[in-house]
Amino acid sequence: MDKNYDRIIFPERSYDFVAPREQFVENMVSYFPKEEKAIISYMDLLDQVATNSRSYFTNKALPGILGTITYPFMTRKFFSYSDRTTFDVLSGLTSDQHLIGVLTGQWGDHGLPPKQSSFAMHAMVARHYLDGGNYPTGSSRSIAETISDLIESHDGVLMVNAGVDEIKIHNGTAVSVIMENGDEIEADTIISNAGVVNTIDRMLKNGNGHSRLIDRLEKVEQTKSYVCLHIGLNKSADELGITNTNLWIYPSYDHDKNVQDYTNNPEADFPVVYVSFPSAKDQAWDENHAGYATMEAITLSTWDWYTKWQDLSWKNRGQEYEDAKTKLSDRILDIVFEQVPGIRHAMAYKELSTPLTVRDLANYQKGEMYGISHTPDRFRQRWLRPKSDIKNLFYT
């Protein structure tokens, strides 16, 4: 991607996040010249989190007694960062609320505003961008295609449109997977990448320690949902002057207040509108789609706003639902047109996905954005590790 990977936009001005690391620091200091010391300290903290996260995550892979014995000293330093919120840590570096608002302008990448998110999560996301953003040639589908080739080359078998109904447990051991059509596939090792909530709540039936696992789910919370406006354009990105810089558009620097105001009143300003340009990021796009471009505009949402339609099937939710989508789409477009005015007369297609869409197509039951929220408490849950409490069952 371009070196300017993100642009953080507020009503009166914008701030560019530019790679490499040295340029990022130079830009931040130019925006906030009185805060150079705080900015340098912030960069150092990002590195400290990265360093200490290695032993924390390594411990999650250690078996049994070895993991238990080493747990205290392999996690202690990481917890000194993960136990604190992002806002708490940054407030210890600076009192400049605008600087804090800018540095946390990517909060949508992990789903929680700074007063709720673990600083460790913020740091891992922010630091990984410092050398620039990357995008797979051929779009995200090329990742799946590459992985599938590798699996099949080792005699693996891939099944699509094959829903799982249950992971069968016998005497405390995962022994097979029962498909929605009734087929049973036996296996010595079962790995679920459906997320712990889906795995425990939907695939493990009563008994076999299920109640204990359900109790553990009460110690974590699911992330909020989102809506995404998918836009198709009948001109190329070059013709429209579109770059591949992501846009983060905010009504104010106080992200937590923005989220709270919108959650309380869906007619309030959007807490964030994230605009990205997938086709402009894909180096292979023009090979098959010359003269066209795509965009996405995403904002926060809540499952509760859509429960009245939850029992209606996809594409058959009625006129009220379609009218609500149209109204929301128009509001999002008003924000998008302010920042990317050139696309107004090139729109050939638009479609809004809602939390119900996420449930139906991605199987997140409340349309979650990222599964489990990245709060400080989340990182204290020792049971969130690859090896589950059930023999032969693993989580990704």
Task: Give the location of each predicted region.
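N-terminal FAD cofactor-binding segment of flavoenzymes
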Residues: M1-Y5, T94
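Rossmann-like flavin
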Residues: P11-Q116
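Surface-exposed helix-capping loop/turn segments at secondary-structure junctions
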Residues: S55-L62, E152-L158, H170, D238-E239, ...
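Helical element adjacent to the flavin cofactor pocket in flavoenzyme catalytic cores
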Residues: S91, A123-D183, D188
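A glycine-rich dinucleotide-binding beta-alpha-beta segment and adjacent secondary-structure elements
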Residues: D96-H110, F270-Y274, L333-T396
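Active-site-adjacent "gating/activation" loops or surface patches in catalytic cores
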Residues: V102-N134, S388-K391
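Mid-domain catalytic core of redox enzymes
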Residues: D165-H289
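C-terminal segments that line or cap access tunnels to active or ligand-binding sites in enzymes
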Residues: N234-L356
